[in-house]
Regions:
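Flexible loop/hinge segments at secondary-structure junctions
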Residues: 1-230
Length: 230
């Protein structure tokens, strides 16, 4: 059994695994990234989502940025035509299959991996460093991202440039109407998220989510004041 984070992958190799081009754990491409690690001569079984999901969008967006073959043959989306593997419904379905199948590999939110005591790989990021998924590497991705109000702060954070950034970090977005039919409802919603941003860090971290950087929160609240009805 190899400990969590002991195996290293880069984006191209990860993409080749999900393309079905790298099919064993001791393939030369994986061995080259893991000198000194005894890798098993066992088949890799890819597990992906069977349902459409933001998790799949984020994962396939990342692969499209780092693996040209993936970009040209599969691309990105909440649901894609997977070249190989089996599908599981939801994060829980993917986690269950990966746990059951020897040599399985999939993608889930970190909270599911931790709750299910699953191993995970280290990944080579855009800065060329191998990093593991954690609050610190997620925060590094968020802190290095180029947020901006011109696109309502919409940003896909995959392959972020930060020195210690986890390369497959995702953001959750809240959508509200700029001209709501129920202004009181919008006001209550914004008050809730003001509380989340100012008081909710501990709850977010307990669920393995990372709070937004303070500077970004200030920008968002200024944007609310300028853009949304009071």
């Amino acid at each position: 059994c190899i400990a969590a984070g002991a195996v290293k992958l880069d984006g191209k190799t990860l993409g080749d695994i999900f393309l079905g081009k790298v099919t064993t754990w001791n393939d030369a491409a994986i061995v080259a990234l893991n000198p000194g690690v005894k890798l098993p001569d066992s088949k890799i079984t890819v597990v992906h989502r069977s349902d459409g999901s933001g998790t799949s969008f984020n994962f396939t967006n990342y692969l499209s940025k780092v693996n040209p073959d993936w970009k040209s043959k599969v691309g990105e989306g909440t649901a894609v035509q997977w070249p190989t593997g089996i599908g599981g419904k939801g994060n829980e379905g993917v986690a269950a299959y990966v746990k059951q199948i020897k040599g399985g590999i999939g993608y889930v939110e970190l909270s599911y991996a931790l709750q299910n005591k699953m191993a995970y790989t280290a990944m080579k990021n855009a800065a060329g460093k191998f990093v593991q998924p954690s609050d610190e590497t997620f925060a590094a991705a968020a802190n290095s991202a180029d947020w901006g109000s011109s696109k309502d702060f919409y940003l896909v954070m995959t392959n972020a440039a930060g020195d210690n950034a986890w390369p497959i970090t995702a953001t959750n977005f809240i959508l509200v109407q700029k001209k709501p039919k129920n202004p009181a409802g919008l006001k209550n919603t914004l008050e809730f998220f003001r509380w989340v941003y100012s008081k909710g860090d501990a709850q977010a971290k307990a669920l393995d989510y990372v709070p937004l950087p303070d500077t970004l929160v200030s920008q968002i609240e200024a944007y609310w004041a300028k853009t949304l009805p009071r």
